[in-house]
Amino acid sequence: MEFSVKSGNPEKQRSACIVVGVFEPRRLSGVAEQLDKVSDGYLSNLLRRGDLEGKSGQVLLLHHVPNILAERVLLVGCGKERELDERQYRQIIARTMNTLNETGSMEAVCFLSELHVKGRDTYWKVRQAVESARATLYNFNELKSKKEEPRRPLRKLVFNVPSRKELALGEQAVQHALAVATGMDICRNVANMPPNICTPRYLADQAKLMADNYDNLTVATVEEAEMEKLGMNAYLAVGRGSEHESVLTLMHYKGAADDQAPIVLVGKGLTFDSGGISIKPSANMDEMKYDMGGAAGVLGAMQALAELQLPINVIGTVAGCENMPDGKAYRPGDILTTMSGQTVEVLNTDAEGRLVLCDTLTYIERFEPESVIDLATLTGACVIALGSHASAVLSQHNPLAHEILNAAQQSGDKAWRMPLWDEYQSMLDSPFADMANIGGREAGTITAACFLSRYTKKYNWAHMDIAGTAWQGGKDKGSTGRPVPLLTQFLINRCNTEAAE
């Protein structure tokens, strides 16, 4: 599928189909009015007749419109003009994409990128349009014996920009969008794999396959034997009950000078989380294959980064592990000595992600990072607090937190900051160890971040809890590809800031 931008008049487009908007109630958009004028009122007559109201998501396909060079004109309902927001814009693009494939058109020119979305420029509208269009094409059927490919004749989609001056901006938007979309596909493919295939070793292998395509991306692994020497006892304890060995995968992307301190992305990679001895209820336990959503997000972000060849140093860290009950599994009541030397009393083996992450966060101190962001499907409490719309951001470093929130706002990959105040730290007190691995029923997302904060004193750090956003359940069960758009935007912004300085 090819995406591009151009600037031109709608009536002069020699295309299989051109796409224009209609607002509610029965009001042509500016571009549609141009077509109406050239076609001697053909479109406005249709609207007066009641063929299309203009409600969001309505479509009307027209053939042989008078004086128009295109074979077809697709009218797309956009709702009330003043109420057109970002979410509705993306939904309109997705509806358009599905309709175009139903029409049989092999190529089309879309003028919906000229719609007014409050506070958004041409770059944003083109980028979101391409990302939304690509998302409609995603289909995970690798493991089906009979692969029924959906009918998708559309091969080329061109988005029109208002003026030739904005072509460069539009082209950059397409480039960024395609990199993000490819990263999201990687994230979704890995996360959707079943846990009998997607093991900690599989995550490492996927990183190595990615590195084969880029000269400035290299991969190393930390195996269990080395973890033992390093004293990563918390990480090792979580994986002891599994047949599959734990693997910490390090992806080194070199886009800048060696002396530039790297940004480190850390992804929780629990390829299956049964809960261990504190076993989870059976209902929806199959979805615990998505407990490696943070690791999948890191893989996706590294793919987008490498595709864009951004001038920045980044280390993607994939903390692969599996939490299973077994005679060798760790138990409630165990006290673990972490790599940092701090001790942890295990009160619940289902609070395992923080144990894997705490040793990983200590390990990466050796890279002297400029900033660290960890991503984890860490707490059910986050889903209760924020639902499935926003990822949680927790940090004691305000500038980094603000950067992440800005990237969320720009990319449309929403996030919300939660407090990380010292008052919550005492909830982790243990009579037998330096801390417990859970803090009780209240403020679960915050106390989990408090736990991690004790291992991040040597660098600027932020934690993202993506438990509600990494995947969706139900009939449309599957990975969402988040937070790849947010992370990619964060890295783009970092490069832009450094270039400006």
Curated annotation (Swiss-Prot):
One MF term in the entry's GO annotations: metalloaminopeptidase activity
Record note on cofactor: Binds 2 manganese ions per subunit.
Cellular compartments per GO CC: cytoplasm
Binding-site positions, Mn(2+) 1: 273, 350, 352
Claim: Metal-binding is one of the keywords in the record: yes
Main subcellular location: cytoplasm
Keyword Metal-binding recorded: yes
Enzyme nomenclature, EC number: 3.4.11.1, 3.4.11.10
Subcellular location per the Swiss-Prot or TrEMBL entry: Cytoplasm
EC class (word): hydrolase
Record-linked SUPFAM superfamilies: Macro domain-like, Zn-dependent exopeptidases
Any one Gene Ontology BP term: proteolysis
UniProt cofactor(s): Mn(2+)
Active site positions: 280, 354
Classification via InterPro entries: Leucine_aapep/pepB (IPR011356), Macro_dom-like (IPR043472), Peptidase_M17_C (IPR000819), Peptidase_M17_leu_NH2_pept (IPR023042), Peptidase_M17_N (IPR008283)
Function: Presumably involved in the processing and regular turnover of intracellular proteins. Catalyzes the removal of unsubstituted N-terminal amino acids from various peptides.
UniProt-listed PANTHER family: CYTOSOL AMINOPEPTIDASE, LEUCINE AMINOPEPTIDASE-RELATED
Family membership: Belongs to the peptidase M17 family.
Designated name of the protein: Probable cytosol aminopeptidase
